[in-house]
């Protein structure tokens, strides 16, 4: 994310922050007392576990006893342990890395490394990029890929597409806000993101291996999170809004409850905190994830691959609720006994209208049976055939 942020700072934000939040300007003068008070806070520090005796240390290493715990030193110890994972050379904003310094770089009291500026910048960038990617990819999928016969499906909702768009556009900013702490960790050197491609980092071979590792790790994480989201109490509170869409359009891809979307994005953010990942590949993979999310909601069934959890598999999930929780592969569904093979009828092209209606009727019958078990008798959806 530091690459994107520095591009935006260089071409736009440095000047904007200099104009809106200049040093010694009205906003700065108003906030100076609060800034001064914050800077004078004495945060606890602890340099080394072994340098403290039993009178002042967290715990005596020679005489371990819970009664020897000194609560006053716990925050300092935890802070020192956290700091030991920080790569200070990766802290964003201390010095430009990719572009020369602009004439405005030091003219705002909100410097590039200021956490409040970072939060605001990240929120603006990620929200706008999220909206842009969502609308562009979903629109292209709708025009060129989406099977518009779905509009006639008995479980298509009244005004469904506009409802999907409304849900997605309102959810994206909240999802961004919830994920900003992960971006801040990356910007402050608490991740394994790197930019140099050389022998010490494994070269291009390591980068190629990072792709399947990222897919497998996130596929596993999302599978278990998705199953958790189908626990009855969690489903009712968080995941049900996404299952409002029994049959989907590409615009359903991001139509989540924002907290649901946040939980399902966690594996993507955890991966670079745990494993090495090239910074450019990181951005490409995040873009790919958004493409994939749209693709599996586009209602176009190209392949019945036994390994890839494609559009057909995800259609089964929306129709029948309790199957195909995976994101990219069918591996964890097979291991977790939740895999359901898509019906062959999904892959028949140019089906006769009467046969299609018969298939949809059977889908609806099975769906209603399972929906009743998952959601209860009352269904608050408004279908086109009502």
From Swiss-Prot:
One Gene Ontology term of the molecular function aspect: delta7-sterol 5(6)-desaturase activity
Pfam families membership: FA_hydroxylase
Keywords on record: Endoplasmic reticulum, Iron, Lipid biosynthesis, Lipid metabolism, Membrane, Oxidoreductase, Steroid biosynthesis, Steroid metabolism, Sterol biosynthesis, Sterol metabolism, Transmembrane, Transmembrane helix
Membrane-spanning segments: 119-139, 172-192, 206-226, 272-292
Motif Histidine box-2, residue numbers: 239-243
PANTHER family: STEROL DESATURASE
Protein's name according to its UniProt entry: Delta(7)-sterol 5(6)-desaturase
């Amino acid at each position: 994310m530091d690459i994107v942020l520095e591009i935006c700072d260089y071409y736009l934000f440095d000047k904007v922050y200099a104009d809106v939040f200049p040093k010694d300007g009205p906003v700065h003068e108003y906030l100076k007392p609060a800034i001064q008070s914050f800077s004078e806070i004495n945060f606890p520090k602890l340099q080394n576990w072994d340098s403290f005796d039993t009178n002042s240390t967290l715990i005596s290493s020679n005489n371990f006893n819970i009664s020897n715990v000194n609560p006053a030193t716990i925050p300092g110890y935890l802070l020192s342990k956290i700091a030991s994972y920080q790569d200070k050379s990766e802290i964003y904003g201390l010095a430009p890395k990719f572009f020369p310094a602009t004439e405005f770089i030091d003219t705002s009291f909100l410097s590039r490394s200021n956490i409040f500026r970072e939060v605001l910048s990240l929120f603006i960038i990620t929200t706008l990029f999220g909206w842009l990617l969502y609308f562009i990819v979903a629109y292209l999928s709708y025009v060129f890929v989406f099977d518009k016969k779905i509009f006639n499906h008995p479980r298509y909702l009244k005004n469904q597409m506009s409802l999907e768009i409304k849900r997605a556009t309102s959810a994206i900013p909240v999802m961004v806000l919830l994920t900003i702490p992960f971006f801040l960790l990356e910007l402050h050197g608490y991740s394994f993101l790197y930019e140099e491609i050389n022998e010490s980092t494994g070269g291009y071979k390591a980068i190629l291996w990072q792709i399947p590792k990222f897919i497998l790790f996130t596929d596993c994480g999302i599978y278990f999170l998705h199953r958790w989201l189908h626990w009855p109490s969690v489903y009712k509170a968080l995941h049900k809004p996404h299952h409002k869409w029994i049959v989907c359009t590409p615009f359903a891809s991001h139509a989540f409850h924002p907290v649901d979307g946040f939980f399902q994005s966690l594996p993507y953010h955890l991966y670079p905190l745990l494993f090495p990942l090239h910074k450019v590949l990181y951005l490409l993979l995040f873009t790919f994830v958004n493409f994939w999310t749209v693709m599996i909601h586009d209602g176009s069934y190209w392949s019945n691959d036994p390994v890839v959890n494609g559009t057909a598999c995800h259609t089964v999930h929306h129709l029948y609720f309790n199957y195909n929780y995976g994101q990219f592969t069918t591996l964890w569904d097979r291991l977790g006994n939740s895999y359901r093979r898509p019906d062959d009828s999904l892959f028949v092209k140019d089906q006769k209208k009467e046969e299609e209606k018969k298939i949809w009727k059977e889908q609806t019958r099975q769906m209603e049976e399972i929906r009743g078990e998952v959601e209860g008798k009352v269904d608050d959806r408004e279908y086109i055939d009502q």
